């Protein structure tokens, strides 16, 4: 009876975790809307999205019935995450504007795909029980899950240096913290160290980001206001409008050679 109730509670927490994880995957959407509008990635980094992609790939492998049975919720949300990250990285690739950065993104995605393919072949052919496969893939999941939660460290360093959270999306930090918290609870029913350890660490990283956001939110507004009030500052929309006007004027001044 107790086991049945615990199993039901675990499923409920897992469904909540799936919803929050979906919010986590979608939380950078305003960032990418901004990128598309400005046609530039500015100072945003592709690292969090590359880290999330490899994390989703290894968790899909972990959730396969031949690796870790009864993990449908793990497969569905991480499969969805893969599709979302591919869309985000495609947008980043189009608007990054630097060929070197595009090559790096392409190389990392190719390396991640090759790694998962090799890992899947080795685990499924060399290990013949789900317990051994769970152990092997679970360790890899731990590593990449921690990497995903730690990926904003470079952004956090920039926040401390510039005293501005402009390029650290708030909702991404909130969703990351909540996602790690819910999946930590899920991993305790029953205890799954491969989910509990990285998500517990993820809670700490998410909390650190929220503390930074609270500490530098006011200074960010002040810095942005000062920048916009500088005599030489021209907003993107103004610059585009001015460029268009200049082109029209130049066209009208050209002699008709027809």
Curated annotation (Swiss-Prot):
GO CC annotation, single: plasma membrane
Domain called MtN3/slv: residue spans: 12-100, 136-221
Gene3D superfamilies linked to this entry: 1.20.1280.290
Record-linked InterPro entries: SWEET (IPR047664), SWEET_rpt (IPR004316)
Induction comment: Induced by the pathogenic bacteria P.syringae pv. tomato.
Family: Belongs to the SWEET sugar transporter family.
Reported function: Mediates both low-affinity uptake and efflux of sugar across the plasma membrane.
Record's protein name: Bidirectional sugar transporter SWEET7
Source organism: Arabidopsis thaliana (Mouse-ear cress)
């Amino acid at each position: 009876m107790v086991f049945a109730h615990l199993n039901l509670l675990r499923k409920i927490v897992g469904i909540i975790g799936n919803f929050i994880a979906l919010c986590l995957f979608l939380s950078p959407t305003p960032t990418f809307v901004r990128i598309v509008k400005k046609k530039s990635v500015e100072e945003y980094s592709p690292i969090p999205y590359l880290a999330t992609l490899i994390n989703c790939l290894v968790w899909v492998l972990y959730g396969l019935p031949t690796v870790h049975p009864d993990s449908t919720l793990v497969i569905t949300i991480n499969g969805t995450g893969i599709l979302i990250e591919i869309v985000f990285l495609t947008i980043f690739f189009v608007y990054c504007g630097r060929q070197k950065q595009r090559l790096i993104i392409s190389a990392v995605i190719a390396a991640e795909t090759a790694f998962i393919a090799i890992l899947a072949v080795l685990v499924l052919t060399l290990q013949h029980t789900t317990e051994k496969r769970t152990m092997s893939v679970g360790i890899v999941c731990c590593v990449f899950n921690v990497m995903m939660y730690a990926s904003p460290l470079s952004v956090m360093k920039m926040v401390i240096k510039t005293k501005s959270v402009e390029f650290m999306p708030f909702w991404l930090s909130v969703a990351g913290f909540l996602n790690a918290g819910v999946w930590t609870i899920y991993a305790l029913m029953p205890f799954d160290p491969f989910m509990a350890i990285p998500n517990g660490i993820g809670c700490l990283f998410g909390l650190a980001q929220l503390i930074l956001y609270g500490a530098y939110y006011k200074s960010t507004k002040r810095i942005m206001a000062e920048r916009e009030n500088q005599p030489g500052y021209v907003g993107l929309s103004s610059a585009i409008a001015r460029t268009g006007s200049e082109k029209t004027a130049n066209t009208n001044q050209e002699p008709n050679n027809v």
